[in-house]
A protein has these predicted regions:
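Metal-dependent phosphoester/phosphodiester hydrolase catalytic core
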Residues: 170, 174-201
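Active-site beta-strand/loop signature of hydrolases that rely on acidic residues for catalysis
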Residues: 53-59, 82-105, 147, 174, ...
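Alpha-helical scaffold elements lining the catalytic groove of polysaccharide deacetylases
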Residues: 70-74, 198-212
């Protein structure tokens, strides 16, 4: 039985979620204690490998992207490791993660953990593409990643429409071999991200590419940079048919529900986990080390 509390609307409109650093930091401190509460009580016991807990978290690890006041690299790594050791997360979808932090976390968790990484790139007006780097010695490139306690196979990026000029994020998929579950982490563009065509909407094409990339037995999601679809949201048209219908969202209370708890300090829900597998638990966790909360979904795999 899926356990959840009453979901509330996460807000709508065209607000930009990465606001001034001071505002984000203040909100982060105010709401962390509230958001860190689990959605439900202790999970029922289950046979090993019959369930899978997947977490998505935008770590806000790229300091130059208004992230300097959201927590140190050490705090971010500790929060990630705690979700693995205390919350039972076995697959992570990560956004705005630094390659150096990812390598350190994998080493701390042990040799049985596996990672896959796709860097962000910047495409200039001349067409030259460069890799986005994290600030700080040894932090390496910034990007999206999969972190898994199980071996990952059939790893591949998903091609999707990206800005002609500007920041290119992306979608990365793999199969959790021991579970036979296809997983995809995504970080979508924001309106105006294409410097050459600031009025172009890219998220509709990116969402279609993401939804088309997943077969049955899947968990997918990440930072989608949009509110849930709804009558008061002018951007609802960007959502394809699969999400919320063929695959239920972590915090989706019913077939007709399109709301969920906020996953960002601005009060918006912009982080998602969708699955066609039976959902058992959904929780939103304030880590104190990002302007995003972590979203955790436990599904039955057998």
């Amino acid at each position: 039985m899926f356990r959840t509390s009453s979901a509330s609307a996460a807000g709508s409109g065209g607000s930009r979620w990465r606001g001034p650093v001071a505002v984000a930091a203040a909100l982060l401190g105010l709401v962390t204690a509230v958001a860190s509460a689990q959605l439900s009580g202790p999970a029922r016991s289950a046979a090993p490998r019959r369930t899978l807990t997947v977490a998505t978290w935008n770590m806000c690890g790229v300091e130059q992207w208004n992230c300097r006041s959201t927590g140190s690299p050490t705090a971010k790594r500790n929060a990630l490791e705690a979700m693995a050791s205390r919350s039972g997360a076995r697959v992570f979808f990560l956004q705005e993660v630094c390659a150096g932090d990812l390598d350190r976390v994998r080493a701390d968790l042990g040799a049985s953990w596996h990672t896959e990484f796709r860097p962000y790139t910047w495409r200039g007006v001349t067409g030259r593409t460069t890799t986005v780097r994290c600030a700080g010695a040894g932090q390496g490139a910034a990007g999206v990643a999969l972190l898994s306690a199980y071996r990952l196979s059939a790893v591949e990026p998903v091609e999707s429409r990206q800005p002609a000029v500007g920041l290119r994020r992306g979608i990365l998929c793999a199969t959790v071999a021991d579970q036979g579950v296809r997983v995809c982490t995504a970080h979508l563009s924001r309106p105006g991200d294409d410097r050459a065509h600031p009025d172009w909407e890219l998220r509709d094409d990116q969402l279609k590419a993401l939804a088309a990339a997943v077969p049955g037995r899947t968990v997918y999601g990440g930072d989608l940079n949009t509110d849930p679809p709804g009558p008061r949201d002018p951007d609802s048209w960007i959502w394809p048919a699969g999400p919320y219908r063929a695959q239920r969202e972590c915090d989706q209370a019913s077939a007709s529900s399109r709301s969920g708890r906020p996953t960002h300090v601005s009060g918006h829900k912009i982080d998602y986990l969708f699955s066609d597998l039976p959902r058992l638990d959904c929780s939103v966790r304030g880590t104190g080390a990002s302007d995003h909360y972590a979203l955790l979904l436990r599904v039955r795999t057998r």
